[in-house]
């Protein structure tokens, strides 16, 4: 492991992830299910970018599952991310649908499932970050 973690950069991005997840929950509770799904995706994307940037790694792209692979996360969490990856564009882009609007295609169940997936991903990332900090501290002792 490298000898430096950028705590400020991690905190900057993880704070954004947390507030975005809260906004997703507000949208879900207000019936804006497509926006809740999109924001759950965004919250997870921000959290993995927190981890990658905090460890000095590239964080280019929007696929949470691919970004998690760069961070060497396990398959179970990557599979949750694959659900969220599908919410990046069609949740907000009317061109994604031949009829109707994005609002017509997302349910309460979709929204709360996306939020739960996002919570799991964020928790996993926060736990891995704490573990890295602990390892680095031990290396320095």
Place the predicted regions along the sequence by residue:
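Terminal alpha-helical segments
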Residues: 1-141
């Amino acid at each position: 492991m490298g000898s430096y973690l950028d705590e400020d950069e991690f905190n900057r991005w993880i704070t954004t992830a947390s507030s975005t997840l809260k906004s997703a929950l507000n949208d879900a509770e207000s019936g804006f299910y497509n926006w809740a799904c999109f924001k759950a995706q965004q919250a997870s994307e921000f959290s993995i970018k927190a981890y990658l940037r905090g460890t000095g790694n590239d964080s280019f792209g929007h696929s949470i599952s691919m970004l998690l692979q760069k961070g060497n996360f396990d398959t179970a969490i990557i599979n949750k991310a694959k659900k969220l990856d599908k919410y990046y564009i069609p949740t907000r882009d009317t061109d994604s649908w031949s009829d109707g609007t994005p609002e017509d295609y997302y349910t309460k169940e979709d929204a709360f499932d996306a939020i739960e997936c996002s919570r799991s991903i964020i928790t996993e990332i926060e736990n891995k970050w704490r573990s890295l900090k602990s390892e680095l501290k031990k290396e320095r002792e």
